[in-house]
């Protein structure tokens, strides 16, 4: 259809100085264009003429109405809108359809991520179709103006995520709402009084959205569980778990199944295993640990070498494939470690009793046994099912005291193992392993769950001793399956893999550290790069910028994950690596144990796709668990700082965003935000490339890594947010 531009009136005939009828506030042309496009996008199937458009966007000035006419003509020429009959236009419906994932944000900046990996597309709330974060959707892409970001409209929700949200109930006389704490949903959820499930005003609750009518501002929901009174520690920790879709209690059917598992070991089972009960064996674990899933045995051989057994709880002997316990463990994929509690992958009877390698109790294990010479070179190894009896349970502190003083129980074995571990570690770093030796922030918690002290957990020789032998066992198991003898076909297996770092991220990291006076070579072999990183990490030890540089270095790395396709582990510099040593708390280790049992017995390879899907699930759940752990740490940080409002602390800028500066305090590593709106001495703009905020007039910079002094302004527990102000 021809595009007809309506004739303009001759405005020169107007008398000079005569006020036009309906003169309103003038709009700039670009703002008018955006406003007009928004009208069409909000009602993509409705036609509009220039009068309707003018009224909707608030244009009363006759001159600007004519400008609306011109803009409509131009947008039609660009195929953004279509003229369906003379002077009436509709949004161009010829935009392509795409399928992908919807990302909802409470600030209205929703987006659509195409499954083919294309550019993210902005989805205005009015065009969201009430899709939820993570939904698989079909989107119609709008015709795009040159230079503008792509936009679209959700036309169909193909797959829905669970529509459950955590928050605080607000109960009035005739109605109730859930005030959500979710960063993806700005709208409170309306709850009919008969759907409260006994919930009271101020309770922490989980609510499921059951309906969201097209024209309704708020979705309708029903309470599915009451977590307790908001502010109480258990309620808040359970709320964090629920927020991430993690379970906070065990199904009774699974616990009943665990209760039926016999603890006694039959003589026939012992007969089929290597017997290590007479060999010195002990565990070394954190002092608050209950699930001891690994033990070490050590004895000196007649030839002067040491035989070291890495004994791992034989969980899969008790947990049968596809049983109710296995299905629950597979769903969870990992134990979750919050600040004050552990949410186990397996029922307590298994992880803390039957499978826990407690002292003076006979236990079934899957073991990797090594003969090492005085240089810690493996002379031979074997993987076998065993029975052990631990002689002693050491805490890390107790084992460390033996190492430092040379005195104590089983001192000969511990000192020998420590010497071997140091040599294994030294050789690993020479091969290109990266030494991220960061300290952990820990909280001392009182009986009410309140944090009373922050301290730093530092890895010492006793920790590193255990780490090295676990790494050795994991690598050996992976090599056993992944590197079969000549003439044998490689079989499907579960590997722990770690890709090389992204070159662009490494370049940005190298640029970042130059401001501190450090250099990093980012080209050359992968060993050259890893050795350069290790040299850098050595140089920053004890410096104020140490924690920041290590944090940014870790961000530049890829995330390790599980896969049936082995590509090696870059960070550890291992060609083959897996997770074998923690089946009580990681489902991939259970998969590895089952595959090992099958292949040791000469079994055929399993179907790869089934295990690759399980690998993807476990990698995903590992990340979810880590996010929940971080959320619990953040909650306790805010709680710890509540009585420190107005106090001044030194810190370092740990993050720079368009909305402000994140500052990590030197004293306790608590992190808070200095909002950009509070930087009122200038207008600051975010320079993403240089990790800084730059003042437009005075050119003052706030850069990542800069030292800064702040005052604690606010500690908001509900939002898990600390707000700081500049102290100077």
PLM ranges: what are they?
Residues 119-124, 185-191, 669-686:
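A short macromolecule-binding patch
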